[in-house]
């Protein structure tokens, strides 16, 4: 086999090593445009888990690399003095992480040495293109982030480049470190961040980062390397401790997140940064590149033609790459919005740094650094106490109380509003009683009803619940009274109007599909059908607005009589009021269309009318779709304007959902995928939020709350299969005083006893499953700062 590798970085060299080792008869050539000892940047970082992977892939190169690594276990987070928050600044050292740093130049030289020893042909200071290797069976394009090969066949590889807004520059210093260190500094120009680690004796990396506004105010766009280094030496004078910054092509850049639709063209395959990048804030660029090499090598070990192996590589490797990129993207967004968290307590800020990428969570961090998690737990409880609530230092965040106006919740778990499509003529029946009652006694602090409609023609389907007559009112009262008598749960009525998404089939018969018969006329902000074959709604006239507003008010008065604890107005998911908010569904030219202020006009009118008749001591919330997941939809600025407007109108909480506005939306799903919008609204608009969306575990709930990204957490699907989700979570964390009906106490006691044993066993398994430490105690490796 003839293999040509274009690009002599870690990805290309490592692949050449693995292939020549296992296919010794193959002729493997690596061609690099730079000199053998040229490198840009300073150090690279690998975790213990990554080192495990390298050891399994190639023991000799692993041993050579680790002999040159500096190792550290802690992450240190330094915050400056912040007037009104931390007068003297703070430092958090959080252990249990296990990282190594190495000079990028040393890494390349060691990989070159290993490759030569195996018989790989290495050529430097040579530009190469695929046509230079007409007899090659395989051409590997490992030619970097600006890959000429990728750009040459751009139409085929279909790269997407997302140029992120923050500016960054790689610098170095002689200052030693014994931890991976984050320095956050505030100047009149703005906030600067330094990501620092030692990679060999007397050498450390300093990745400088700042937002575009601070970059411009500081004048860094007009400075050269030396001048910007001197400027940053002034910013980080205390942190540098007398050491100077070192430059090496330390140019200010914006990070390009690169994804490719295809990785393979004929016998050419993209590898490393040429096909996908991962942001430096999780230290995964070189890891991703070298693991690409391992994945491609394994594809060839499995046998078959070159085409078969390349297809196997792309299909088998893509998911792992996308997961790493997703974690990196979530992390980089946290740093882009660091101003959002600047007034957090030092403990909450540090917890946010640690959990920013979702790779580390509450339970995981408790294994790594139990003292820090205990501090976080105490700090969260103290915030609740400061709000006048009976908090308990021993409980995790999800079991701390929360209050909205005069309503106090026993915990922060919410049963999300979920349409059951099981009512007859809008009347909730026995199914609904069993559904809501079982979740109430299951321990959740707050239970939302499904979207309940204020009129018959406001329903999504014939099976939707309503609140427009006495029969419905009596049926809802039965449910609310049961919950109040037999549980500590509070109940929130969600009122909404389906608008253009009304008169459709039951979900299991065809979600959002129009009824073939028995439908009713529908209305919307504009006469735009949801699907091309959907019923065309009539554009609302002023008389329609008056009628619908009054129907909402009448339903609100019924909710008062029933005794609901809280009320929510549904302004999301493309339903009637949401259709006014989104520019995709509102093309009106009157005072209710156009600007966001105009688009808000009618939804706010309805909300204010409801708030006026709803008791002053009881809270109200609004559910919104914070993004439409479609081009031309609601912007972040619009979203914040919506949240602020409802807060000014008397909303106590924003229930943050996304999408379902238009049929051709392209949502990006994943764990906790709607959390960024809850975070943004809570910490920029300054209103309490409830997050929802693929949140499935108590661990995730605690992570979200402790990081200050939401105040309440709603779970839907987990409550469908486990009405006692909260009771089980209480047992998991040893919370004994969760409310439980006396009829169920024996079961609760057994659950608590069994959970204690199960959690001890689980902790032991998790500790055993952790990557083994590559610390120098076990090997002859240098410690960082030695």
Task: Describe the role of every protein-language-model region.
Residues 142-144, 278-279, 418, 717:
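Glycine-rich, N-terminal phosphate-binding loop of Rossmann-like dinucleotide-binding domains
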Residues 1-4, 8-73, 95-106, 285:
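Glycine-rich FAD cofactor-binding loop and adjacent beta-loop-alpha segment at the N-terminus
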Residues 29, 268-270, 447, 713:
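Residue-level marker for buried hydrophobic side chains located in beta-strands
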Residues 48-170, 372-382:
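Conserved N-terminal helical subregion
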Residues 374-786:
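Flavin-dependent oxidoreductase catalytic cores
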Residues 8-18, 140-141, 171, 251-330, ...:
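Conserved mid-domain beta->alpha element of the FAD-binding
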Residues 298-388:
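C-terminal helical "tail/cap" subdomain of flavin- and related membrane-associated enzymes
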Residues 113, 135-255, 259-260:
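Conserved FAD-binding catalytic core of PHBH/FMO-like flavoproteins
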């Amino acid at each position: 086999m003839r293999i040509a590798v274009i690009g002599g970085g870690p990805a290309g060299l490592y692949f050449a090593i693995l292939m020549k080792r296992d296919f010794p008869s193959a002729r493997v050539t690596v061609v690099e445009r730079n000199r053998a000892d040229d490198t840009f940047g300073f150090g690279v970082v690998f975790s213990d888990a990554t080192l495990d992977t390298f050891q399994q892939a190639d023991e000799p190169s692993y041993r050579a690399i680790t002999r040159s690594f500096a190792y550290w276990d802690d992450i240190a987070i330094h915050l400056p003095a912040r007037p009104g928050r931390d007068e003297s600044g703070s430092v958090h050292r959080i252990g249990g992480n296990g990282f190594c740093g190495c000079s990028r130049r040393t890494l390349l030289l060691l990989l070159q040495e290993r490759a030569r020893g195996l018989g790989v042909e290495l050529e430097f200071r040579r530009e190469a293109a695929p046509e230079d290797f007409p007899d090659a069976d395989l051409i590997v394009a490992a030619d970097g982030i600006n890959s000429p090969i990728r750009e040459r066949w751009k139409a085929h590889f279909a790269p997407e480049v997302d140029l992120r807004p923050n500016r960054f520059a790689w610098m170095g210093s002689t200052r030693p470190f014994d931890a991976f260190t984050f320095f956050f500094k505030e100047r009149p120009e703005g906030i600067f961040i330094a990501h620092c680690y030692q990679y060999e004796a007397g050498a450390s990396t300093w990745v400088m980062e700042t937002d575009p506004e601070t970059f411009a105010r500081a004048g860094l766009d007009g400075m050269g390397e030396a001048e910007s280094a001197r400027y940053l030496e002034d910013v980080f004078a205390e942190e540098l401790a007398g050491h100077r910054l070192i430059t090496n092509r330390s140019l200010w850049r914006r990070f390009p997140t690169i994804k490719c639709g295809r990785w393979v063209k004929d016998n050419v395959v993209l590898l490393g940064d040429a096909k996908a990048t991962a942001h430096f804030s999780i230290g995964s660029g070189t890891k991703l590149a070298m693991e690409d090499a391992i994945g491609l090598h394994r594809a060839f070990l499995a046998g078959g033609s070159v085409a078969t192996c390349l297809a196997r590589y792309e299909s088998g490797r893509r998911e792992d790459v996308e997961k790493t990129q997703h974690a990196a993207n979530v992390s980089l967004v946290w740093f882009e919005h660091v101003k959002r968290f600047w007034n957090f307590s030092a403990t909450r800020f540090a917890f946010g740094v640690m959990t920013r990428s979702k790779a580390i969570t509450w339970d995981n961090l408790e294994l790594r650094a139990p003292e820090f998690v205990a501090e976080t737990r105490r700090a969260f409880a103290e915030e609740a106490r400061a709000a006048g609530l009976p908090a308990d230092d021993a409980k995790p965040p999800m079991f701390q109380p929360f209050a909205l106006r005069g309503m106090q919740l026993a915990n922060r778990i919410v049963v999300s509003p979920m349409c059951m499509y099981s009512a007859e003529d809008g009347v909730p029946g026995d199914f609904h009683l069993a559904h809501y009652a079982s979740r109430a006694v299951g321990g959740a602090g707050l239970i939302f009803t499904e979207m309940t409609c204020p009129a018959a023609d406001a329903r999504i389907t014939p099976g939707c619940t309503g609140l427009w007559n006495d029969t419905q009112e009596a049926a809802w009262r039965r449910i609310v009274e049961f919950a109040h008598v037999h549980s500590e749960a509070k109940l929130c009525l969600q009122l909404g109007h389906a608008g253009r998404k009304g008169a459709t089939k039951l979900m299991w018969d065809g979600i959002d599909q129009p009824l073939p018969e028995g439908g009713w006329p529908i209305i919307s902000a504009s006469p735009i059908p949801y699907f091309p074959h959907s019923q065309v709604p009539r554009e609302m006239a002023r008389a329609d607005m008056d009628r619908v507003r009054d129907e909402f008010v009448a339903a609100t008065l019924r909710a008062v009589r029933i005794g609901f604890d809280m009320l929510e107005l549904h302004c999301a998911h493309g339903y009637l009021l949401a259709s006014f908010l989104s520019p995709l569904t509102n093309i009106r030219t009157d005072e209710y269309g156009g600007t966001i202020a105009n688009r808000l006009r009618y939804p706010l009118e309805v909300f204010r009318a409801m708030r006026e008749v709803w008791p002053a001591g009881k809270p109200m919330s609004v559910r919104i779709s914070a993004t439409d997941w479609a081009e031309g939809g609601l912007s972040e600025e619009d979203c914040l304007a919506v949240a602020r407007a409802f807060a000014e109108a008397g909303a106590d909480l924003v229930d943050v959902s996304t999408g379902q506005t238009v049929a051709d939306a392209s949502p990006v799903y994943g764990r906790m995928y709607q959390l960024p919008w809850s975070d943004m609204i809570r910490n920029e608009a300054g209103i309490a939020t409830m997050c929802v969306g693929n949140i499935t575990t108590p661990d995730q709930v605690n992570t979200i709350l402790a990081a200050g990204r939401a105040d309440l957490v709603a779970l839907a699907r987990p409550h469908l299969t486990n009405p006692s989700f909260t009771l089980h979570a209480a047992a998991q964390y040893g919370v004994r005083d969760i409310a439980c009906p006396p009829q169920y106490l024996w079961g609760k006691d057994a659950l608590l006893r069994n959970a204690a044993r199960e959690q001890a066993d689980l902790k032991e398994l998790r500790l055993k499953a952790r990557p083994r430490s590559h610390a120098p105690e076990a090997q002859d490796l240098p410690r960082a700062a030695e």
